[in-house]
């Protein structure tokens, strides 16, 4: 078990030097934009190591980790079973470019956990998974248009970047240069949680919509759960109009329950995308679904998809070890820890007198500085995001590493213990007071 993190955060000098060095060879100094701290200001922390619930940065500062590598680390960092599995796999060879028994076992685990999934294809990232699922939906239906929801992020796929969440929301970008007008023209962007808008889009585009893609529960505009009946309504509308429903469970899959969001709600998609937890923190992802749809993939069908490193044996080993270790006790701990975190957040922010909403999507958590619940991207953007930088940095100074963006979900691990929650509880009052005292003009953003 990790030792209680030290509240010794006087220096970020080593991280600052590394950031300057990185900026000379890596665009923006980071390999994914949100890591650059652009929306919160300050120096991004360069991590040297992690164990259990603890991150240690290049300056030796320790933090309770509430990012968990953006979701995958449900067991905590460097879990012995996962580390041992990776070590054994690596000694047997790093990559073969050929099938292995382990990749069959991982696919069997996924199929066994998520009932609507008959077949699975492994890929290397969530972006690949969503890109491939959309291509497959278009190939299966013979249609071109897709529906997505504002604030939902499905990776940096050209057709899915319009009004996306995650880093796109963090940086305030409507889309991205390089996405052509033709690609954008086939993407219909609608408000999340608005079934009337979806019904109207189908009526306005008869026989043209291949699929609706949605985060099964949104986590990339913050934690925003689907309103009761929303996913079921999507299921009904897609069936009525001959379109496919793609449930993006890259974030929720095998985190919010052993069967992902499907295990909580029971609404079946035609296609699913997975990542994060199923890879144990290594680069791997998957897409899967009904056999009649998945069998349109090459070599059985005409829809092409491939990958040199797909099914990488080391990543597969990490994923298998994680799923095997993720028993009922782990999921109970995740739910319990999320509820406890939410309670501490509510207590501190209420005491500080700042308007806020602590929201959950399963065991994913978010804080919105708002006087009303956040149900879609518009209400997320309408919150007082200028309070978040002060809140974030006070937590960081207190030894708590939260997501460096107001538009990202917070993630707990099963490794959090009494020491971890004591550190969180100690850091929160000052952070809440900092948020309450913040002004739009004084924001670091």
UniProtKB/Swiss-Prot annotation:
It is found in: Cytoplasm. The keyword Isomerase applies. Keywords: Cytoplasm, Isomerase, Porphyrin biosynthesis, Pyridoxal phosphate. It catalyses: (S)-4-amino-5-oxopentanoate = 5-aminolevulinate. It comes from Nocardia farcinica (strain IFM 10152). Its cofactor is pyridoxal 5'-phosphate. Belongs to the class-III pyridoxal-phosphate-dependent aminotransferase family. HemL subfamily. Pathway: Porphyrin-containing compound metabolism; protoporphyrin-IX biosynthesis; 5-aminolevulinate from L-glutamyl-tRNA(Glu): step 2/2. The modification N6-(pyridoxal phosphate)lysine is found at residue 276. Homodimer. One of its GO terms (cellular component) is cytoplasm. One of its GO terms (molecular function) is pyridoxal phosphate binding. GO terms for biological process: protoporphyrinogen IX biosynthetic process. InterPro entries: 4pyrrol_synth_GluAld_NH2Trfase (IPR004639), Aminotrans_3 (IPR005814), Aminotrans_3_PPA_site (IPR049704), PyrdxlP-dep_Trfase (IPR015424), PyrdxlP-dep_Trfase_major (IPR015421), PyrdxlP-dep_Trfase_small (IPR015422). This is Glutamate-1-semialdehyde 2,1-aminomutase. PROSITE patterns: AA_TRANSFER_CLASS_3 (PS00600). It comes from the Bacteria. It is an enzyme of class 5 (isomerase). CDD domains: OAT_like. Its EC number is 5.4.3.8.
């Amino acid at each position: 078990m990790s030792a209680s993190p030290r509240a010794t955060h006087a220096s970020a000098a080593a991280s600052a030097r590394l950031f300057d060095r990185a900026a000379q060879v890596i665009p923006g100094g980071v390999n994914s934009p949100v890591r650059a701290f652009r929306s919160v200001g300050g120096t991004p922390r360069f991590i040297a190591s992690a164990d259990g619930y603890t991150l240690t940065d290049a300056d030796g500062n320790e933090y309770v980790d509430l990012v968990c590598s953006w979701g995958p680390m449900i067991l905590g960092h460097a879990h012995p079973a996962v580390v041992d599995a990776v070590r054994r796999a690596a000694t047997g060879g790093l990559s073969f470019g050929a099938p292995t028994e382990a990749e069959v076992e991982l696919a069997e685990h996924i199929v066994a956990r998520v009932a609507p999934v008959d077949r699975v294809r492994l890929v290397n990232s969530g972006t690949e998974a969503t890109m491939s699922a959309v291509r497959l939906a278009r190939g299966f239906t013979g249609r071109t248009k897709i529906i997505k929801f504002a604030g939902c992020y499905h990776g940096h796929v050209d057709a899915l970047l319009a009004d996306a969440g995650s880093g796109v929301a963090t940086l305030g970008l409507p889309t991205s240069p390089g996405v052509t007008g033709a690609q954008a023209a086939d993407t219909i962007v609608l408000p999340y949680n608005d079934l009337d808008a979806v019904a109207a889009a189908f009526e306005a585009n008869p026989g043209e919509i291949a699929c609706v893609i949605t985060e099964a529960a949104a986590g990339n505009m913050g934690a925003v759960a689907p309103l009761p009946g929303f996913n079921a309504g999507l299921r009904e509308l897609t069936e009525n109009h001959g379109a496919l429903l793609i449930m993006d469970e890259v974030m929720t899959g095998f985190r919010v329950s052993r069967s992902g969001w499907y295990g909580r709600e029971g609404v079946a998609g035609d296609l699913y995308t997975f990542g994060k937890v199923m890879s144990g923190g290594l680069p791997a992802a998957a897409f899967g679904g009904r056999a009649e749809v998945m069998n349109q993939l090459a070599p059985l069908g005409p829809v092409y998809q491939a990958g040199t490193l797909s099914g990488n044996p080391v990543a597969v080993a990490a994923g298998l070890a994680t799923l095997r270790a993720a028993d009922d006790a782990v999921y109970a701990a995740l739910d319990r820890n999320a509820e406890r975190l939410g309670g501490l957040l509510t207590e501190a922010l209420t005491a500080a007198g700042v308007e806020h909403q602590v929201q959950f999507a399963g065991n994913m958590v978010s804080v919105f500085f708002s006087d009303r619940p956040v149900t879609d991207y518009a209400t997320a953007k309408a919150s007082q995001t200028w309070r978040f930088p002060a809140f974030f940095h006070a937590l960081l100074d207190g030894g708590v590493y939260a997501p460096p963006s107001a538009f990202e979900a917070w993630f707990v691990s099963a490794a959090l213990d009494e020491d971890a929650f004591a550190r969180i509880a100690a850091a929160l009052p000052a952070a809440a007071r900092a948020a309450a005292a913040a002004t739009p003009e004084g924001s670091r953003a």
